[in-house]
Curated annotation (Swiss-Prot):
Residues that coordinate or bind Ca(2+): D100, D415
Main location as per UniProt: endoplasmic reticulum
Protein name (record): Calnexin homolog ARB_00147
Subcellular compartments: Endoplasmic reticulum membrane
């Protein structure tokens, strides 16, 4: 216990020293620029034309409609309403272009829905489809969606509020929560035989970009059924609608015949025991697995006459032990220390070793079964539901765009939406918007990082011998400043502080361990009448603790003992 107290005192002194070093002369160790000197261009609306281009300019609310419908959920009896609010505003984090506004999700942990109808329905038959838009995660994204839906053109689209039940043709964009981290690309395909729609999900979609800077998501679907997904202009996924989606667009030509059954004489066994094999004459199935090691010899320091356990020499008979009532007191036993000093105590017996003659149960070796017919499978028949759609890129006509999302983070900003048929125009639109704002945002991000003051610069002239407190404070300040942006880099740049933290944690673990080891051993378990007496005392204590008269409780105790 004295050692524990010393360790605790030493640890406390270390913590106080570190704290005082960091707290003394509190001066700002990091300085941020009061105002950014980075020049930003002023927003100018694009002149690019397409079936749908949106930059959230004036009168945006005449084009977009916020939904307050009830969200349908067949898996739950609860009703969810789209209560999330939307706003069109400039970015509040790393602004790139002056006056450039976007559509912003305003509420965390809420369902949001908003949509805008196209001036004309978009028919993609025989054309290239290009879907492109910016996403800015101003508050990062740990759990939520930022994807869009291109809604199917139909009568309901013009008569009902937008919700999760609104039929869509394409769903595209980032989604992240828990193990999910992907850029969705889902399209609905109409079965030409049944008329039913089925979702086709992209296999192995790319991961999203989690950054507070603007990210640009682009989907290109070509009339040859190939597609490409780009993030920030970089192609990250290429494939084909006919091969890279599940379930596949086209069903198999043939299917298993459900009425076919395996013949009764069908042989499934590929291997059989060799009928001509015979057990060797010297094969002893009864030989034991282990035998006594006849070559083993008793160690010279083996103590034959010493017992393995002895009465605990430190045990003391309890003061209230009554030999007449409780019987003879017997001290508890402990391992004999003499046995631990030598090879062992008591009667010595040679150890067991594996029997070299052991072979176990004999069985014939396996050989190829001459009657084996292979793995049975039902015969194939033509699929009555088979069809072949060679052009799934001829999507159903689309009449609107919608964002229907749930997110734990607010301030997700959408901007510069392009939906059309020209890759060239989409790239020009990117050059006018994303390519201008992204470098500015990167510069803003860099400028916002803490600027180290001279007192914590690596080139400081402070030495530990000259000023121990100042030296420690400088190291801690530098570590904290760097750790705010990159903990790993902080550990690499200032390993002394990381080592000190590790030492403190190790000391805590040692103290906890020593407290555990120094705790008193549990009392020896009473037997016989002692156990009965203990139970009687517990009963008496319970009566006293319950608030009963103390004198009456003592009388009960004496009566129990005399009985």
């Amino acid at each position: 216990m004295r050692l524990n107290a010393q360790l605790a005192s030493l640890l406390l002194s270390s913590i106080v020293l570190v704290g005082s070093a960091h707290g003394a002369d509190e001066e700002p160790v990091a300085e941020k620029k009061e105002a950014s000197s980075i020049e930003r261009p002023t927003f100018v609306p694009t002149t690019i034309k397409a079936p749908f281009v949106e930059q959230f300019t004036d009168k945006w609310d005449s084009r977009w409609s916020v939904s307050h419908a009830k969200k349908e959920d067949a898996k739950s009896d609860e009703e969810w309403a789209y209560v999330g609010e939307w706003s069109v505003e400039e970015p509040t984090v790393f602004k790139g272009i002056e006056g450039d506004k976007g559509l912003v999700v305003k509420n965390p942990a809420a369902h949001h829905a908003i949509s805008a109808k196209f001036p004309k329905k978009i028919d993609n038959k025989g054309k290239t489809l290009v879907v492109q838009y910016e996403v800015k995660l101003q508050n990062s994204l740990s759990c939520g969606g930022a994807y869009m839906k291109l809604l199917q053109e139909n009568k309901k689209l013009h008569s009902e509020e937008f919700s999760n039940a609104s039929p869509y043709v394409i769903m595209f964009g980032p989604d992240r929560c828990g193990a999910t981290n992907k850029v969705h690309f889902i399209f609905k395909h109409k079965n030409p035989k049944t008329g039913e729609y089925e979702e086709k999900h992209l296999k192995a979609p790319p991961a999203i970009k989690v950054t507070k800077l603007t990210s640009l998501y682009t989907l290109i679907v070509n009339p040859d059924q190939t597609f490409q997904i780009r993030i920030d202009g970089e192609p990250l996924k290429n494939g084909t609608l006919l091969e890279d989606f599940t379930p596949p667009v086209n069903p198999p030509k043939e299917i298993d015949d459900e009425k076919d059954t395996k013949p009764a004489d069908w042989v499934d066994e590929e291997k059989i025991p060799d009928p001509e094999a015979k057990k060797p004459e010297d094969w002893d199935e009864d030989a034991p697995f282990e035998i006594v090691d006849t070559e083993a010899t008793k160690p010279a320091d083996w103590l034959d006459d010493e017992p393995t356990t002895i009465p605990d020499p430190e045990a003391v008979k309890p003061e209230d032990w009554d030999d007449e009532e409780d019987g003879d007191w017997i001290a508890p036993t402990v391992p004999n220390p003499k046995c631990e000093e030598g090879s062992g105590c008591g009667k010595w017996e040679p150890p067991m070793i594996r029997n070299p003659a052991y072979k176990g149960k004999w069985s014939a070796p396996l050989i190829d079964n001459p009657a084996y017919k292979g793995v049975w499978a039902p015969r194939k028949i033509p699929n009555p539901n088979y069809f072949e759609d060679k052009t799934p890129s001829n999507f159903e006509p689309m009449g609107a765009i919608g964002f229907e999302i749930w997110t734990m983070q607010n301030d997700i900003l959408f901007d510069n939406i392009y939906i059309g048929h020209s890759i060239e125009d989409a790239e020009k639109f990117k050059a006018e918007t994303y390519d201008i704002k992204r470098p500015i945002e990167e510069a803003e991000e860099e400028a916002s990082k803490p600027k180290l003051s001279p007192q914590i610069d690596d080139e400081t002239d402070i030495s530990f011998t000259q000023d121990p407190i100042g030296y420690v404070r400088a190291k801690i300040d530098r570590f904290i400043s760097l750790a705010q942006d990159d903990p790993i880099a902080a550990l690499q740049a200032v390993p002394e502080v990381g080592g000190a933290i590790g030492a403190i944690l190790a000391s805590l673990l040692i103290i906890i361990g020593m407290f555990g080891l120094s705790s008193p051993a549990p009392p020896a378990k009473s037997t016989g009448k002692t156990a009965e007496k203990t139970e009687k005392e517990k009963t008496t204590e319970a009566v006293t603790a319950s608030g009963a008269d103390s004198g009456q409780g003592e009388a009960k105790k004496r009566a129990a003992k005399s009985g």
